[in-house]
Amino acid sequence: IFLVYGNKNFTRAKHAHKKCSQFIMPIHGKIELYCENKSLKFQKKLDYKKKEAYLIKPLTWCKIKFLTDYSILMVFCDQEYDFKDYIVKYKHFLKIIKKK
């Protein structure tokens, strides 16, 4: 479990995981989530007042934009931190999902 803090228009993530799933939920403020995997692309707004959350599965490219100042995002992971699990280059991510 970890927390991510951000102010309005601040962007985080911009990566995917090979094996790790992440359950994310704002505990203060609002975020906009941009996700892409082999089968779909979408964006979704999450608001802590509405108790909204989302499960990001492995091999899903994700970008998070904070929509309000003082936003806090709580992230639950099913794996311990391992930098080798990260896919940080979008072109590399596209090659990987094309093979699957």
Stretches with model-predicted labels:
Residues 62, 71:
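Glycine-centered loop/turn positions within well-structured domains
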Residues 1-54, 69-70, 76, 82-100:
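Non-catalytic, conserved peripheral segments adjacent to functional cores
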